[in-house]
Amino acid sequence: MIFRSHRSGLALLARAVITLLAALPWVVCGIGAATAQSKAPCKEMRKIKFGVSVSPPNVVHTPIYVARDLGIFARHCIDAEIIEFEGGASAANLAAVTQGQALATINTTAIAQGLKAKQFWGMAPRLPQAYMVSEDIKTAADLKGKRLSATGGGVGGFNWVMGREVLKTAGLKVDDAQFVSSATAGRLPGLLAGQLNGVALHPEDVYLAQKKKPGLHVLVGLAELMPKYFFNAYGAAESVLGKDRAMVRDVATALIETNRAIYNQKEKVIPIMVEATKKPQDAVSFSYDYLVKNCVWSVNTGFSKERTEWSIENAIENGDIQADKKPTYDQVVDVKLGEEALKAAGGPTKIKGCSD
């Protein structure tokens, strides 16, 4: 904006601007109006454990690390301890949530099967992965009899579920392929070594796979295969929500602010992501650009009734959820808490065309 004024008017304007800036406690870019407001000093830091569903995490899973390392958690009086699990559907991850030991990722299937917990923040509604295959695989039909990944929880885990969906496109069933369980860190090495013929990989691993072994290729993007699937949400035990709802709301607010910072502050978050993922910076930067361009991370609550209900119906169709135990949207998601957290973060917004 260009101002035209007499010299005296400009002097008054300059003094006004200086006074205004001096009154602000800090200026924060892109993490919500609430963060830029003056906060009272913390009476005490609340120690909270956060579960991350992959060890080491993929780029998409790093908002928890960003919130800790940028001091966003600290501004909300949260002292975060991060625990890495072998899959969001793993017994250890679900037990940590059930027992109120950690806030971690949970899905609709676990809730329908009896997990007494609710989702409170949708970290990444959209699927970021691609199904990567060996050079000899040209179509999904070629996966018959091949070795497919079941990392992240084995049968019922994420890679197993995605492999099942890919097989279905060729009229195949899970018994038509060999599913191989391993640690989540073994996904890319297994494909590179020829131990696997198919695996769902995150963008940074797709980049590294094609760089190290150009014959490997993407069979299908999972967002293309399942455009309405809800990918990743954090949840808390009902006992925790009942006992310390304000704490969970503060966590959700901090994480909404974090995802907004991720979209707006690439130069600050990339080093944090490199450290957390243990991946080369070029691969992390590639993944970051893909995730931002495709609006994988949320910028608001991240919740979508359409995606959640579609995921429930898909699980019923596949036999993962019994039809008579079908959960409602409100049984899966604590909508009110999400709305309260969003309001505290400054309300709804859109960043780079993303608005989930």
Q: Which role does the model predict for each range below?
A:
Residues 242-323:
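Secondary-structure end/capping motifs
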Residues 1-13:
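N-terminal secretory signal peptides that target proteins for export/translocation
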Residues 31-36:
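Sec/Tat signal peptide C-region and signal peptidase I cleavage site
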Residues 37-183, 187-190, 197-203, 218-222, ...:
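Short, glycine-/small- and polar/acidic-enriched structural segments
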Residues 15-30:
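Bacterial N-terminal signal peptides
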